[in-house]
Design a protein with these regions (language model features):
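Hard-cation-handling environments
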Residues: 1-12
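Glycine-rich, acidic loop segments that terminate in or are immediately followed by a histidine
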Residues: 16-129
C-alpha cells in the first residue's frame, strides 16, 4: 500500500488525493496523511473497481474515503468532511474527520471535480464553526 500511496497520490490545494482504484489495494487515511505530512489538511482515497459491486467483497464498487490529517496540530475538527461524502451520495457519511461514500455517475473524475470545487471553498462550505 505504501508504494501505491507514493506513486498514485497528488496534493491539490492541501487535499491529498490517492488513487487506489483498480489496484486491489486499500488503506486508511493514516498512511496517506502521514505520507503527505504538513502539505495536506485532509485526504481523499479512491478505491474499488469500476465493475465492482457491494455484493462482491473481493471486487468492491468504486468508493471514496475522506480523512482529516490528525498528524497536524489542530488537524481535526476544522472541516466537516462528511459534507463531501454526502454531496452526491445520500447513503454516504461518517463523521467530520473520517467518512466515505460510493462514487456516483458519471464517474470518478466528475466526482473529484465536485469535491475539489467544494474543497476550494472549504472555509465557507466545510468549516466547522
Amino acid at each position: 500500500a505504501q508504494l501505491v500511496v507514493e506513486q498514485h497520490t497528488v496534493i491539490i490545494d492541501r487535499l491529498a488525493i490517492c488513487r487506489m482504484d483498480e489496484k486491489g489495494v486499500r488503506s486508511n487515511g493514516y498512511l496517506v496523511t502521514a505520507w503527505a505530512g504538513d502539505r495536506a489538511d485532509a485526504c481523499c482515497i479512491i478505491h474499488g473497481y469500476a465493475d465492482g459491486s457491494i455484493e462482491t467483497p473481493s471486487r468492491p464498487a468504486l468508493s471514496a474515503s475522506f480523512y482529516a490529517n490528525s498528524f497536524l496540530e489542530n488537524g481535526q475538527n476544522r472541516y466537516d468532511l462528511s459534507r463531501l461524502a454526502t454531496a452526491m451520495d445520500s447513503t454516504g457519511g461518517g463523521h467530520a474527520n473520517a467518512c466515505g461514500c460510493r462514487i456516483q455517475a458519471p464517474g470518478v473524475d466528475a466526482n473529484l471535480e465536485t469535491w475539489l470545487g467544494m474543497w476550494a471553498n472549504r472555509d465557507e462550505e466545510l468549516a466547522i464553526r
